[in-house]
């Protein structure tokens, strides 16, 4: 793979060099977190629009823009205010793997271990890439979640802070949900200790991000009596077993937390993913 060489004084110089290379060869240009790039460099949509227009007829470039939160990505790319919407040919959402998809990876784990792995990663391909199949499931979990330098140790917080204005309120809701068994709306609001307006706004955010979901039972009456539950099992695992023990993990006691607190009771949640 030939990459642009040399140094570039500006982002514009680098982008122009990449697009110029596409005149002579077919290329795919991937921006891993487009919303974050635009937040850091607001001129990017203008540059991309100009370059896409300039090289539309003779460039051989496929540009792939990626992001974590689908609705925000759609707004940035496909919305009426998007500068590059006319150049977008298609969009798609990468769904979490199923448990069968994880089995198909061919890793030498038992079904119970694969269920653990699926639960802690939420089945997301971006999380599964951090799994080392030469290690035990327990060692993988400790390395990723129970060490301050772990690749997934702060991942739920990073996502909340990236896409929710008041991440502290979201933390309160998710921690309360992790302690309760499919609570009603009012039960969850009370447990979170948030004001009703703040609670309602953050609940809408979490539902929109598919971190939590609601299931209305036939005998439970109005929607406010729906059962609330985690949809993203990585968030469930994190708020149940990592969030309450972050101080211990920062002090280097993550292995002890996992061995004595998490591992003995962890399997009780595995029925959620079978």
Q: Residue ranges of each PLM-predicted region?
A:
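Accessory nucleic acid-recognition modules appended to NTPase machines
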Residues: 127, 131-133, 137-274
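Sensor-1/coupling segment of RecA-like P-loop NTPase cores
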Residues: 28, 36-81
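Short, conserved catalytic or adaptor-binding loops enriched in Gly and charged residues
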Residues: 81-87
């Amino acid at each position: 793979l030939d990459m642009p060489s040399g140094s570039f004084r500006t982002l514009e110089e680098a982008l122009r060099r990449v697009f110029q290379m596409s005149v002579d060869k077919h290329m795919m240009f991937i921006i891993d977190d487009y919303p974050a790039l635009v937040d850091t460099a607001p001129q990017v949509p203008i540059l991309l629009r100009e370059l896409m227009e300039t090289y539309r007829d003779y460039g051989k470039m496929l540009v792939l823009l990626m992001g974590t939160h689908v609705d925000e990505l759609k707004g940035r790319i496909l919305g009426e205010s998007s500068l590059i919407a006319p150049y977008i040919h298609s969009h798609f959402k990468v769904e979490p793997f199923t448990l069968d998809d994880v089995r198909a990876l061919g890793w030498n784990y038992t079904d119970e271990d694969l269920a653990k792995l699926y639960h802690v990663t939420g089945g997301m391909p971006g999380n599964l890439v951090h799994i080392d199949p030469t290690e035990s499931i327990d060692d993988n979990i400790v390395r990723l979640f129970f060490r301050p330098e772990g690749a997934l140790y702060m991942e739920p917080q990073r996502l909340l802070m990236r896409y929710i204005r008041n991440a502290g309120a979201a933390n309160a809701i998710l921690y309360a949900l992790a302690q309760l068994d499919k609570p009603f709306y009012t039960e969850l609001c009370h447990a979170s200790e948030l004001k009703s307006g703040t609670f309602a706004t953050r609940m809408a955010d979490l539902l929109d991000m598919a971190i939590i979901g609601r299931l209305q039972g036939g005998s439970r009456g109005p929607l406010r009596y729906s059962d609330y539950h985690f949809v993203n099992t990585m968030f469930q695992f994190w708020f149940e077993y990592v969030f309450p023990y972050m101080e211990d993990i920062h002090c280097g006691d993550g292995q002890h937390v996992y061995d004595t607190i998490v591992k003995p009771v962890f399997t009780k949640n595995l029925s959620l993913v079978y």
